[in-house]
C-alpha cells in the first residue's frame, strides 16, 4: 500500500519512482482517490526533475491500462494494426489520405483522433464537415468497419485512457503541460490503447508547431520513439516542417475537399504529398507490409493510381454514415462559405516567412475552430489556394482565397493573412518537408 504524498515526496527529492508507485498514483487519478492538488504536485515535480526512460514507460503503460485496451485477435485480421499520430499543425490533413492509402495496401488503421486544439485543426472537426459522418460508432461497429474497410477514424471515448483526461485537465491549469515525459505519456497512452503493432509519429517543427524549437521537437520525437518501443510497439518518428501551411487549404470542408482531390489525383500539393508518402512508408515498413522505402513507395503510388485508396476513403465515409457517393460528389455535400474572394499583398515580393500559428488562429477567429469546448464550428470557412514560401506574389498572384461568412469576417481574416506573411525582395532558401527520421 502506498501513500500519494510519499510518492510525491520521493519524486520531489529527485528519486526515481517504481512501476508499482506510478501505477498506484495513476489508478488513483482514475478512481478519484487522488486529489487535484496531489496531481498538480506530482506534475510539477516531474516538470522539474524529469523522468528516466523506465519511469516514462511505466507512466505511459499505467495511463494506457487505466482504461480499455483494444484487442483485435478475435477478428483474425490478415495484416498489421498500424496508426499515425501528429503533434498538429495547420493544413495538416494527412490522416484523411494516409488511413485509406495504408488500408488499401493491406494495413488496418483504427485511428482514434482529436478535435482542434488552439491554432491546430482537428481531424474529427474536418470529418464532421461531411453530412451525417458519425465519429462515435459503438465498439462493435468500429470493429466491423476495421474488418470490412480497413480504416475508421473515430473520436476518443471515455473508456480509453481515462486517467489522462483528469491528469491533462490539471496540467492545463498548473503550467505543467510542456513537460516531455508528461506529453509523451499523454499522447501514447491513447495511441497504445488502440492495440497497435506499429506506430509512426509526425512531430512538427517550425512556426506552426506545438513545440517552440527544433531541439524540443526532436527531444519529444526521441522520447516518444523510446517509450513506445519500450512499451512493445514498433515506432518511428519523422520531424516534418510546419513553417508554412502544409496543404493548399486550411479549415474544415476546404481540407476535406483537398483530401478527396489528392486521393483521386485531381490535385496533389507537392509538400502534402511528400509528408503523406513519407508517413505511409514508415507505416508499411514498420507493419511489415513492405521491405524497404522503394517497395513501400511503389505500393502506395499504385493504390493512388488505380483508385483503390480513393475507393477505401469512400467506403469509410459510407460505413460511418456519410453519403455513399461522397467521393464522386463531394462538392454537392460539403458546405461552402457565403463569401469567397482572394486577398493580395500590399506590395510585391517573394514570400520569405509565414507565421503559421497566426494563420491557424485566423481560421479559428472566422469560426472554423473553437476557443472553448462549447463553441460551434462553421465548417465552410477557411483558406484555399495558399501561397507557399518562395512564391512571388503581386497584384496577379494572391496570398490566399478567403472563405468567410460575411464581409466583416473576410476583412479581419485578410488583415491577419497579410500580417502573418512576410515578403522580401529575394527568394528564401526553401526548407525540406521532412527534416529527420528517428528510429530509437
From Swiss-Prot:
GO terms for biological process: pyrimidine nucleobase metabolic process; thymidine metabolic process. It comes from the Bacteria. Keywords: Glycosyltransferase, Transferase. It catalyses: thymidine + phosphate = 2-deoxy-alpha-D-ribose 1-phosphate + thymine. GO terms for molecular function: 1,4-alpha-oligoglucan phosphorylase activity; thymidine phosphorylase activity. Gene3D superfamilies: Nucleoside phosphorylase/phosphoribosyltransferase catalytic domain (3.40.1030.10), Pyrimidine nucleoside phosphorylase-like, C-terminal domain (3.90.1170.30), Transferase, Pyrimidine Nucleoside Phosphorylase, Chain C (1.20.970.10). Its EC number is 2.4.2.4. Pathway: Pyrimidine metabolism; dTMP biosynthesis via salvage pathway; dTMP from thymine: step 1/2. One of its GO terms (cellular component) is cytosol. NCBIfam families: PRK05820.1, T_phosphoryl, Y_phosphoryl. HAMAP family: Thymid_phosp (MF_01628). The enzymes which catalyze the reversible phosphorolysis of pyrimidine nucleosides are involved in the degradation of these compounds and in their utilization as carbon and energy sources, or in the rescue of pyrimidine bases for nucleotide synthesis. Homodimer. Belongs to the thymidine/pyrimidine-nucleoside phosphorylase family. This is Thymidine phosphorylase.
Amino acid at each position: 500500500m502506498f501513500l500519494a504524498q510519499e510518492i510525491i515526496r520521493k519524486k520531489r527529492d529527485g528519486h526515481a519512482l517504481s512501476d508499482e508507485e506510478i501505477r498506484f498514483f495513476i489508478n488513483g487519478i482514475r478512481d478519484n482517490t487522488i486529489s487535484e492538488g496531489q496531481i498538480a504536485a506530482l506534475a510539477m515535480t516531474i516538470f522539474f526533475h524529469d523522468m528516466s526512460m523506465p519511469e516514462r514507460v511505466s507512466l505511459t503503460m499505467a495511463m494506457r491500462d487505466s482504461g480499455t485496451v483494444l484487442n483485435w485477435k478475435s477478428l483474425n485480421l490478415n495484416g498489421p494494426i498500424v496508426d499515425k499520430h501528429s503533434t498538429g499543425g495547420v493544413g495538416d490533413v494527412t490522416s484523411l489520405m494516409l488511413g485509406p492509402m495504408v488500408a488499401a495496401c493491406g494495413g488496418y488503421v483504427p485511428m482514434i483522433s482529436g478535435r482542434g486544439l488552439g491554432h491546430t485543426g482537428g481531424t474529427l472537426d474536418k470529418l464532421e464537415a461531411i453530412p451525417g459522418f458519425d465519429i462515435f460508432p459503438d465498439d462493435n461497429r468500429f470493429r466491423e468497419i476495421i474488418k470490412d474497410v480497413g480504416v475508421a477514424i473515430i473520436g476518443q471515448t471515455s473508456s480509453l485512457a481515462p486517467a489522462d483526461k483528469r491528469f491533462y485537465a490539471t496540467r492545463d491549469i498548473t503550467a505543467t503541460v510542456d513537460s516531455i515525459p508528461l506529453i509523451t505519456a499523454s499522447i501514447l497512452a491513447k495511441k497504445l490503447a488502440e492495440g497497435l503493432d506499429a506506430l509512426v509519429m509526425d512531430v512538427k517543427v517550425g512556426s506552426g508547431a506545438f513545440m517552440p524549437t527544433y531541439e524540443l521537437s526532436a527531444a519529444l520525437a526521441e522520447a516518444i520513439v523510446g517509450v513506445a518501443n519500450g512499451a512493445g510497439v514498433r515506432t518511428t518518428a519523422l520531424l516534418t516542417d510546419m513553417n508554412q501551411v502544409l496543404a493548399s487549404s486550411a479549415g474544415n470542408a476546404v481540407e476535406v475537399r483537398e483530401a478527396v482531390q489528392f486521393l483521386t489525383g485531381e490535385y496533389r500539393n507537392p509538400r502534402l504529398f511528400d509528408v503523406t508518402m513519407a508517413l505511409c512508408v514508415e507505416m508499411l515498413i514498420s507493419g511489415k507490409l513492405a521491405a524497404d522505402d522503394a517497395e513501400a513507395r511503389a505500393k502506395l503510388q499504385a493504390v493512388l493510381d488505380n483508385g483503390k485508396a480513393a475507393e477505401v476513403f469512400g467506403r469509410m465515409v459510407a460505413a460511418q454514415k456519410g453519403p455513399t457517393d461522397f467521393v464522386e460528389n463531394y462538392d454537392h455535400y460539403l458546405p461552402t462559405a457565403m463569401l469567397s474572394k482572394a486577398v493580395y499583398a500590399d506590395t510585391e515580393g517573394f514570400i520569405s516567412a509565414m507565421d503559421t500559428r497566426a494563420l491557424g488562429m485566423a481560421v479559428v477567429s472566422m469560426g472554423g475552430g473553437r476557443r472553448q469546448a462549447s463553441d460551434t464550428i462553421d465548417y465552410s470557412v477557411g483558406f484555399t489556394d495558399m501561397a507557399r514560401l518562395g512564391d512571388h506574389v503581386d497584384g496577379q498572384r494572391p496570398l490566399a482565397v478567403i472563405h468567410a461568412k460575411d464581409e466583416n469576417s473576410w476583412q479581419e481574416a485578410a488583415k491577419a493573412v497579410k500580417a502573418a506573411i512576410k515578403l522580401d525582395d529575394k527568394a528564401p532558401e526553401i526548407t525540406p518537408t521532412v527534416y529527420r527520421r528517428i528510429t530509437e
